[in-house]
Amino acid sequence: MPIRVPDELPAVNFLREENVFVMTTSRASGQEIRPLKVLILNLMPKKIETENQFLRLLSNSPLQVDIQLLRIDSRESRNTPAEHLNNFYCNFEDIQEQNFDGLIVTGAPLGLVEFNDVAYWPQIKQVLEWSKDHVTSTLFVCWAVQAALNILYGIPKQTRTDKLSGVYEHHILHPHALLTRGFDDSFLAPHSRYADFPAALIRDYTDLEILAETEEGDAYLFASKDKRIAFVTGHPEYDAQTLAQEYFRDVEAGLDPEVPYNYFPHNDPQNKPRASWRSHGNLLFTNWLNYYVYQITPYDLRHMNPTLD
């Protein structure tokens, strides 16, 4: 799926170097196709890096995807140039009257922060409430999963004593579910979080269907039966080096972090890690776009009536 982005977005050249099909707005305007409109609420500090990661996964199908980047934190960023934010991001007020086929809410490094202490917690709640009537399907990632479970289902914040960091094995629970179609019975995916997602807790509080779990019984992938919301508690979008960058950052900060599990060859941080989750990440996002967005979204977005057959 060629992603449609502004011509000047840094991700264009970055992804083209990887032979990822990126269609600029100027080229896409010549095609008589109604693109899928996907809004990305990017909560990560290094926004350009996160853009590259998600756009890579959204690019692998024959339809156009029109990407809109959203920010809700008005504070000055220490990790992303203000010019980039001003040029490529919109504020909620700019899009609140629009409808979208899909919404992705990224993770954020807020695992040890109480919800009410998050600077933009009211804005998160506002976006989630708005999405019920303006978005066909929403995908929450990592910390955003914890936030959404609290806002939508009242699940209290669950925090691990130690950070979960590494590449973990998971197994699917429903092999014929659309979101896991084509998955191997067992697959690897990276995690980097303090948030805890016991599968039993999610079953107790919600009617969400858990589609994949970790070997330890944590929920990894789950969704509503109507396909309107989906949750992934790990980071299938991560680059091969992302966990390493986080590890060495914490080492330099004197935090004495654990070496990420099952990540560095021979468990030696001096060895170059390899991504063992790329096929899983690509398939997950392709399935979400196809079965949870494209198959049920209305052709005319002015009328939000997803087909939930």
From Swiss-Prot:
Site (Important for acyl-CoA specificity): G111
This protein's UniProt keywords: Acyltransferase, Amino-acid biosynthesis, Cytoplasm, Methionine biosynthesis, Transferase
Catalytic activity: L-homoserine + succinyl-CoA = O-succinyl-L-homoserine + CoA
HAMAP family on file: MetA_acyltransf
Family: Belongs to the MetA family.
UniProt: substrate binding residues: K163, S192, R249
Organism name: Escherichia coli O157:H7
Record EC number: 2.3.1.46
Protein name from the UniProt record: Homoserine O-succinyltransferase
Site feature (Important for substrate specificity) residues: S192
